[in-house]
Amino acid sequence: MKLAIVGTHSTGKTTLISTLAKAFESQGKRVVIVPEMARLCPFPINEGTTAEAQKWILEKQISEENSFDDSEAVVICDRATIDNFAYFFRHCAQFKPEEDLAPWEALAVDHASTYDAIFKTQKLAIAAEADGDRAVGEVFRQEMDDIITRLLEKYSIPHILLPATTDYAAHVAFITEYLHGRDAVNRVSTNFS
């Protein structure tokens, strides 16, 4: 099973993923976490990102995800290709309108179908904390949240909106209940096939 947690930066995705991984591990499941590629990127990110950086992040995300071919593991991705593409889209719209985004957009959208479930965080009215990597400006965070939401809607990418809370235990319960319910539906539909 491959899950992705998406949303604008500084919405608790990484902490949620760590908490979720511990919950799965406590159930005896093997967990693999695909970290956020922007944190590993050798090029500028945030408001000062470049097309080169965003291409690197998108390609690296797909490569890392594809390197885990273990049907027994729960793979949890810190971001998905669609929210990585959102940062690329913003950069090109503002600074490089001549860039041909179509192949990159298609790649991000097509790859979205490889996730068994995508969960989107909500940007709450809580200031972002500086961590040395991500920008903390509210305008930029909101802009990215809006672009991610528009892309998910534009391409009808199935996703589940997480509750508007900073309670990670509530998020884990929500996700596990969703997955349990989905698995039950799949078992029933398989029995009728």
Residue ranges and their predicted role:
Residues 46-91, 96:
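Conserved nucleotide-sensing/catalytic segment adjacent to the nucleotide-binding pocket
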